[in-house]
Amino acid sequence: MIKGFDAEFSNLDHYIRVITDRIWEGRRIDDINRYYSSDCAVETPSSVSVGAKAVIDGTIATLNAFPDRRLLAEDIIISGSSEGAYLSSHRIFSPMTHAGAGVFGTPSHRIIYARTIADCVCINNKIVHEWLVRDQAAIARQIGSNEKELAQKWLDASGGYFKAAMPAAPSYYVSQIEQKGHAAKYADFLDQIFRSFQKINADHFYAQQIISALPGGESAVGQNQIMQFWQSLAGSLELSSFQVEHSVANEREGRPTAVAVRWRAKGIHGFSGRYGQPTGCSLEILGITHVEFQDDRVVREWHLIDDVAIWMQILSPRK
């Protein structure tokens, strides 16, 4: 049993798995009102919404476009306590068919595979605050488009890139940022990636057999490929700030140590790289990364950023 939650839930992992199954697998959409607070704020890389109704509306729209969408839990990395609030970092793999009209355009009837990570603040049987990053670029590519083209379509429909400020998390919740161990090691590594890339020795950090799941549904195998990804991403930015917002490690018997880090990089699109030639526009990259450590080296990574949202910032008309 977990304090403040219904007696049926043995721990936070169990709670997240059960309510996900009920709402999205079981299509019990009205249960969102039961498990989300009325003032729950949800931030994605391209939007901020407040309230359970917005979650319901988004769920209905997604299911209209992808009626058979599954939400398969790959991992849930937990932090917090009953004294304040919990946070679940939930990595989801979704197979689905693009069978309905919506923001992704005319149905392509193609089978799509995409990942999402949702960081949810939970207390008293409800989700009260959430950060969610979905690999929209993977969806764009698999329906026959690409991230830049989809970004332009969304800009044409909306008139530009507008993102409201995310309300502060409830005062009783303090984000966990571990100061030692594997979570701290990985957070420091990310900071170095964005601030001093040339000083990094990948061999001190990554296992030789590192496998990374990258945005766009891509994969990197080995140190060279993953460092090329980092260079193309971080190397695009003339950095103004980099912040680790959450970092935690979960030790599991018989399994690699699992780490979740939510991070945010801001700067100017000042250099050639992942997003083409520099445009001088301001960029914000919200990322959530899951990592597995074995023998003090990273053996697996899952990086979630939204390349469509980043292209929207680049392509949005200047004022």
For every predicted segment, state its role.
Residues 1-319:
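C-terminal and inter-domain tail/linker signature
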